Amino acid sequence: MARYRCCRSQSRSRCCRRRRRCRRRRRRRCRARRRAMRCCRRRYRLRCRRY
């Protein structure tokens, strides 16, 4: 429904529903289905982890 994007403004790397763009060079969307997830970069890819 609402796609999560990697927002560096909130606690470095965190997934949020807001439409704020990522300040990083490459825009990558996080594949998050739940609210409580963090963005982690693995092998040049951003993934979400539960915390």
UniProtKB/Swiss-Prot annotation:
Protein name: Sperm protamine P1
Family membership noted in the UniProt record: Belongs to the protamine P1 family.
Pfam families registered for this protein in UniProt: Protamine_P1
Any single GO CC term annotated in Swiss-Prot or TrEMBL for this entry: nucleosome
Gene Ontology biological process terms from the UniProt entry: chromosome condensation; sperm DNA condensation
Subcellular localization: Nucleus; Chromosome
Domain of life, source organism: Eukaryota
Entry GO MF terms: DNA binding
Known function: Protamines substitute for histones in the chromatin of sperm during the haploid phase of spermatogenesis. They compact sperm DNA into a highly condensed, stable and inactive complex.
Tissue spec. comment: Testis.
Lineage per the UniProt record: Eukaryota, Metazoa, Chordata, Craniata, Vertebrata
Keywords: Chromosome, Developmental protein, Differentiation, DNA condensation, DNA-binding, Nucleosome core, Nucleus, Spermatogenesis
